[in-house]
Amino acid sequence: MKIDSKNRLDIALLILRLGIGFLFILHGYPKMMGGIEKWAGLGSYGMGSLGIHFFPTFWGFMAAFSEFVGGIMVLLGLYIRYFSVLLIITMLVATCSHLVGGDGIMGASHAIESAVVFTCLFILGPGKYSVNINLKQ
């Protein structure tokens, strides 16, 4: 494959999706496999920082799901805009949790950076080299 001005953006999107998707699979897997206790703790910490104390297990599961399944979907480029929204919301909650928890901007920087990446993926879409594009053909 020759890199030229016609496919440069698509190759960059592929590299971005593969990298961030893989990392979110790694981050989300232990949370997803942690079960109910892990989800409840995650939900209590995350949503509790926003003053939301009901259904902590549900919120924790949603965070784990969005990171693990969202990572898979981003890696594949499948339904990327829907999963980008889930991941943006998850990263905004993580940002708030770090800031309220006293970690400061440096503690929240990973979540902020990830939210920026997923915002860009939401705007740009998956690119030409994705499962989503191949399903449409």
Residue ranges of each PLM-predicted region?
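Perimembrane loop-to-helix junctions flanking transmembrane segments
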Residues: W39-F55
